[in-house]
Amino acid sequence: MACRQRGGSWSPSGWFNAGWSTYRSISLFFALVTSGNSIDVSQLVNPAFPGTVTCDEREITVEFPSSPGTKKWHASVVDPLGLDMPNCTYILDPEKLTLRATYDNCTRRVHGGHQMTIRVMNNSAALRHGAVMYQFFCPAMQVEETQGLSASTICQKDFMSFSLPRVFSGLADDSKGTKVQMGWSIEVGDGARAKTLTLPEAMKEGFSLLIDNHRMTFHVPFNATGVTHYVQGNSHLYMVSLKLTFISPGQKVIFSSQAICAPDPVTCNATHMTLTIPEFPGKLKSVSFENQNIDVSQLHDNGIDLEATNGMKLHFSKTLLKTKLSEKCLLHQFYLASLKLTFLLRPETVSMVIYPECLCESPVSIVTGELCTQDGFMDVEVYSYQTQPALDLGTLRVGNSSCQPVFEAQSQGLVRFHIPLNGCGTRYKFEDDKVVYENEIHALWTDFPPSKISRDSEFRMTVKCSYSRNDMLLNINVESLTPPVASVKLGPFTLILQSYPDNSYQQPYGENEYPLVRFLRQPIYMEVRVLNRDDPNIKLVLDDCWATSTMDPDSFPQWNVVVDGCAYDLDNYQTTFHPVGSSVTHPDHYQRFDMKAFAFVSEAHVLSSLVYFHCSALICNRLSPDSPLCSVTCPVSSRHRRATGATEAEKMTVSLPGPILLLSDDSSFRGVGSSDLKASGSSGEKSRSETGEEVGSRGAMDTKGHKTAGDVGSKAVAAVAAFAGVVATLGFIYYLYEKRTVSNH
């Protein structure tokens, strides 16, 4: 006979005390091989019933044996006296040879269950003549019918236990005087993995069965055979399918149960209580607490948020919880009296009842010791791993103020506080011969009072330090003359000069990519910027930028690119400055420009070797510019800027990480001739008109932006050559004159 039990909750006492329960369905199969009481009304005999009776949760099913004479009999439900029951509705199926009747109107309530009487009569005989009556007993199927027992599973630390009603007095193994040996067998697991054990075998593997007058209690350890373990992170769930079979003379009882157990405690913070369950085949159907049954679709409207990614997390607003005073806690404790979670599982409904409690609301730790410094501070360090999940160090504050740490290293998970004894909410008190100073470091929640889910770890740490009374600090005001105004000067700055592939300025060239190769008239994009500064009131201003043939920025010859913060106005292709957009945090910390690659010449020779670039710059105060270069407007008289510019000590010089190799388009110095060496003249104009383009060149300059002696020398050579030509011409004319004079004579 198959019996299904459903029940409420039961809190066992004594060794059964536990804080977690799993509510699950139980199926009890009870096959009656013989009835307990068979009566022939006419003959008063008790023949054994040859069929099978099955007790379900709602009805009784009687199965008659198949024999050649079965079509000649008739069966009906009657009362114990053999009289018809007019309110009883039953179904007699001659084809299947079954009779089905409900408990409500077709049975009589007896102690521990239901009693039903049927009458079987041969159709060929006279009415009631030769009729046989059989009485059957079915145990109470509902848990509430069995003296208040509960079908809930209790979760202990290492095992789960559940109770079943004791439906017959002979179920216990205490009938040693009987000739027939009764026994239990246990089937653990589901499907092909199911394993059947005798009771002694199960006891050896850690199972246990306890039977008293009203109930049977079965213990299943978490590591037993057939128990499925689901784990995800730090959360665990155990699930098991069981069949307990008891065989006794004339009857066979099978209890079938499926149980789930989640033994992990809940976690709590300032706003919510969180229950975590790992991923398993069950699907949440409803949540019940405080006489409320809430469907999963209505959880959010009732202050519960469901997070169904990677398992399941239920976040209960603390406004739903109760509070109580506990001997274990200094402050009040949040809890729920009971919480039932109902799941759809294979394909039955399985419920789990738990009793969640938050841990005590007390400070995480109290730090004492030699923390007080001689200058009146407390120094303390806080690490992110002091809570689980890790602490968000950016939310830490001291006392009732906004005092923040003096040092923070997120990569190391460390912050350091330097707490003044006379500030940041520090309190003091006298204890014996000591003065004790106390403060609290805590994390703040932006959503308190609760308005959203907060998964931040709660952190409160009390820090204390003390002085001896004899060493107590004294505050003394010493009047003195007003000190002179300090001379303010900016501290050291670090600049960097880099080159970029294009004007997007996304990624600079690395040091291992130098020397860079550039062809004539190809732009070279450069950037100067300030490193490791977050001050929005400073501004980077270029002074000069120039090129040299060696890595020494002071070497000669030099070729100017930027002079006094402006493009060099003697170039054929002038330097172009690029604005710095909002893509960077502090645009005033950058200067960007590009120059066109030219053939660099010195002393009438074109240099095709490596060229090094350098820049000098200074840092200006945007709020109070202290140098004319801080507010340059181009073009401006170079002489005027030089006269009022910054001193050399205020400037900083930076260089590119490596040189640039300047080549012509065909990797030779095509188009570069003597005409290119002349600063002006018809030959230069003729060259440009014949070729239709300008082949740029730069003459070497001194540091003031003027032509160097090498270029002046080339002009002198040209002048001497011209003078020699004139002398030769005059000599040739004189020669012709003398020759004509001789011939005339």
UniProtKB/Swiss-Prot annotation:
Name assigned to this protein: Zona pellucida sperm-binding protein 2
Domain observations: The ZP domain is involved in the polymerization of the ZP proteins to form the zona pellucida.
Signal peptide region: 1-38
Propeptide intervals in chain numbering: 641-745
One example GO MF annotation: identical protein binding
Disease: Oocyte/zygote/embryo maturation arrest 6: An autosomal recessive infertility disorder characterized by oocyte fertilization failure, due to defective sperm-binding to an abnormally thin zona pellucida in patient oocytes.
Annotated segments matching region Disordered: 469-491, 673-708
Subunit structure: Can form homopolymers that assemble into long fibers (in vitro). Polymers of ZP2 and ZP3 organized into long filaments cross-linked by ZP1 homodimers. Interacts with ZP3.
Family indicated by similarity: Belongs to the ZP domain family. ZPA subfamily.
Tissues where the protein occurs: Expressed in occytes(at protein level).
Disulfide-bonded cysteines: C55-C138, C88-C106, C372-C465, C403-C424, C545-C615, C566-C634, C620-C630
Keyword Signal attributed: yes
